[in-house]
Swiss-Prot record:
InterPro entries, per the entry: AceGlu_kinase-like_sf, AcgluKinase_fam, ArgB, Asp/Glu/Uridylate_kinase, Glu/AcGlu_kinase, NAGK-C
Name of the featured protein: Acetylglutamate kinase
Native source species: Pseudomonas paraeruginosa (strain DSM 24068 / PA7) (Pseudomonas aeruginosa (strain PA7))
Catalytic activity: N-acetyl-L-glutamate + ATP = N-acetyl-L-glutamyl 5-phosphate + ADP
Site residues, Transition state stabilizer: 33, 255
Gene Ontology biological process terms, A to Z: arginine biosynthetic process via ornithine; L-arginine biosynthetic process
Length: 301
């Protein structure tokens, strides 16, 4: 393909802007939570795969954790298994857990691995059960109303929380030039399976690896102020203030708390990225403007 002079000039501009960032992140690990619209559009899926392969090619180490809620819901519906949610978490009985494992560990994980490999990468698919990659325990959910004298414990089945990460396995794969692609299924002390929120798995993996960045792909432009303007950079202190005054609320709270916990746990920065934008991951790390909100321990003005 022959580029016009204007196109060639644009490519040169992009590369010159990216070079300092590439130098800064060579040898660093970036954990990317892949989900939402970025997993649904064929164009965005291909763009994500190219982004990940390019990162690896320039010496950056991407680790991918993926979701798959809509795909799980689709198969449950086809099997006439009803879905129930409590506080945004899917109640996961034994039959639902079987479906979760089939969809996340089979269909979705292998599709992503295949896509990355078709674009020149060496991706390898894993669930948290492989070599006890993601150790977990049952998540306890409680609810209390003013009328109750003590909280009610709600059983939401095989829903778990992360208790440990097999860092040795991930480091071995990364050093072998593989791109790990992780399905968010954890394993308990007795070998039982747990369905875990993909954001939470990504955050814990990033903490365990002492990653440079945790990148959460979403279907929004980033965190916004009360006027609807994207907040491009925030400190953990500023994020807590936005939670306290109600600017950040509802469905974004678990994602933001995951990002905060990762940064407080040693990850250099967490990013809430607009996954609807083509090449969102590269734009966020290799350009001055980015496409989302960066959260770090550093105070920003």
């Amino acid at each position: 393909m022959t580029l016009s002079r204007d196109d060639a000039a644009q490519v040169a501009k992009v590369l010159s802007e990216a070079l300092p960032y590439i130098r800064r992140f060579v040898g660093k690990t970036l954990v990317i939570k892949y989900g939402g619209n970025a997993m649904e559009s064929e164009e965005l899926k291909a763009g994500f795969a190219r982004d990940v392969v390019l990162m690896k090619a320039v010496g950056i180490n991407p680790v991918v954790v993926h979701g798959g809620g809509p795909q799980i819901g689709d198969l449950l519906k086809r099997l006439s298994i009803e879905s129930h949610f409590i506080d945004g978490m899917r109640v996961t009985d034994a039959a639902t857990m079987d479906v979760v494992e089939m969809v996340l560990g089979g269909q979705v994980n292998k599709d992503i691995v295949n896509l990355i490999n078709r674009h020149g990468g060496s991706a390898i698919g894993l669930t948290g059960k492989d070599a006890e990659l993601i150790r977990a325990k049952k998540l306890t959910v409680t609810r209390q109303t003013p009328e109750m004298t003590k909280p009610e414990i709600i059983d939401i089945g095989h829903v778990g929380e992360v208790t440990g990460v097999n860092v040795e396995l991930l480091n071995m794969l990364v050093k072998g030039d593989f791109i790990p692609v992780i399905a968010p299924i954890g394993v308990g002390s007795n070998g039982e399976s747990y369905n875990i929120n993909a954001d939470l798995v990504a955050g814990k993996v990033a903490e365990a690896l002492k990653a440079e960045k945790l990148m959460l792909l979403t279907n929004i432009a980033g965190l916004m102020d009360k006027q609807g303007q994207v907040l491009t950079g925030l400190s953990t202190e500023q994020v807590n203030e936005l939670i306290a005054d109600g600017t950040i609320y509802g469905g974004m709270l678990p994602k933001i708390r995951c990002a905060l916990e990762a940064v407080q746990g040693g990850v250099t920065s967490a990013h809430i990225i607009d996954g609807r934008v083509p090449n969102a991951v590269l734009l966020e790390i290799f350009t001055d403007s980015g496409v989302g909100t960066l959260i770090s321990n550093r105070k920003r003005h």
